[in-house]
Amino acid sequence: MRSETQMLPESGSVLADALLKVDANVGFARAVVDGLVGGQVWTAGSEGSAAHHVAHPYGMSLVWGDGVHRVFDEIIAHLREGRYRTREEWLQIDPRWASLPWEEKLTAPGGRSAVSVHRRVNFEFDPNLFRAGRDRIAVPDGWSVVPADASDFARPGSVVPAEFWDNAEDFLKHGGGWREQNDELRGALAFASFRFDDELELGIETHPEARGQGLATAAAAHMIEDLLAQGILPVWSCREGNHASVALATKLGFHPVRTLPYYGLTPPV
């Protein structure tokens, strides 16, 4: 795969237009194609620009395009070889081609990577549901909610701004976030993981010592209010098996609208 930063501007424009046909939350792919973050893009050689694979630095990836079905074997070979893969990859498929035998081919014997099979849930935000439950979401006693700043970029954790943005300046420019804190601890952070047009996908991270207090809910609710005031639509996606994230999304006014194939692929050996 080649770095998105090496692509010609017109190539990125073509890919961005092609992504508009994908009926799924693909902000991570847009972030790479639009040049907001680094990343990798591969195009099937035998079908020109009609079948693509994009990988975000966080590890999320997408196969999409009008010609995926015509070059399915070439795509499978590319994914199974995995020469580009240096960390665990979380692969999503353009819903138009979800019925192709991805699981059968990716998990076939002889591959260089371990493959796990999951489902990813895309949610849709309902402002009426959010407002109906907003009064029940309060900042816990002893905590305060404040806007994120540059120091939050380097926050430790697995779902944190440094995994989604190249630097603190870009993180704050494209959405920033809100954090819950007390005198001793930064308890939770709700932040912009992907920003595209007038939509923003949320990321959430809670400090291990602060879990179970409702901090993530309160931080996310403040961020959603801020987004709505700016005319920005909140977006939420997660693995179906992440029950805490599914429950949090529901509490914040999101409801599931589609469930898609989702594959974990380890680096090749």
Stretches found by the model and what they are:
Residues 27, 38-154:
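Acyl-donor-binding surface of acyltransferase catalytic domains
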Residues 69-79, 202, 206, 212-228, ...:
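Conserved acetyl-CoA-binding loop-helix of GNAT-fold acetyltransferases
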Residues 169-208:
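A conserved beta-strand-loop-helix scaffold within acyl/acetyltransferase catalytic domains
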Residues 8, 23-24, 127-128, 177, ...:
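Long, contiguous binding/interaction regions
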Residues 98-112, 217, 240-258:
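Conserved active-site alpha-helix within GNAT-family acetyltransferase domains
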Residues 48-50, 185-188, 244:
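Glycine-rich acetyl-CoA-binding "A-motif" of GNAT/NAT acetyltransferases
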